Amino acid sequence: MNARGLGSQLKDSIPVTELSASGPFESHDLLRKGFSCVKNELLPSHPLELSEKNFQLNQDKMNFSTLRNIQGLFAPLKLQMEFKAVQQVQRLPFLPSSNLSLDILRGNDETIGFEDILNDPSQSELMGEPHLMVEYKLGLL
């Protein structure tokens, strides 16, 4: 055995990172890096995609700031409390909900959009056994 000891032998050895493959054809090392998630690496496909995803949130913020400037702090707080109360009221899990009261609060009850035509609950793909859905929602399963 060398007089310098085991620690110096480890220092003199080639680092593992130099032995690993690098470049465009490198395989993903699951043991060191874990599972790769492609969803996190995707960029928006179009510049307007992010704007469209956040449209309702931005619209609500703009309405709240306008209300605050015109009527004071009470009006947006009251409207936000009404939004929370309306969002908590739901039907049973197997029944479709139109959220009409939320549409009325936002002023969307007088507009017709593509979701009004293409979002028919009778054509939903997520139909299930009503008793199982209620038991799952209540945490009995």
UniProtKB/Swiss-Prot annotation:
Short name of any one Pfam family annotated for the protein: UMP1
Record's keyword terms, sorted: Chaperone, Cytoplasm, Endoplasmic reticulum, Isopeptide bond, Membrane, Microsome, Nucleus, Ubl conjugation
Lineage, highest ranks first: Eukaryota, Metazoa, Chordata, Craniata, Vertebrata
Localization per record: Cytoplasm, Cytosol; Nucleus; Microsome membrane
Family classification: Belongs to the POMP/UMP1 family.
Alphabetical list of InterPro entries matching this protein: Ump1
GO biological process: proteasome assembly
Full protein name: Proteasome maturation protein
Protein task: Molecular chaperone essential for the assembly of standard proteasomes and immunoproteasomes. Degraded after completion of proteasome maturation. Mediates the association of 20S preproteasome with the endoplasmic reticulum.
Gene behind this protein: POMP
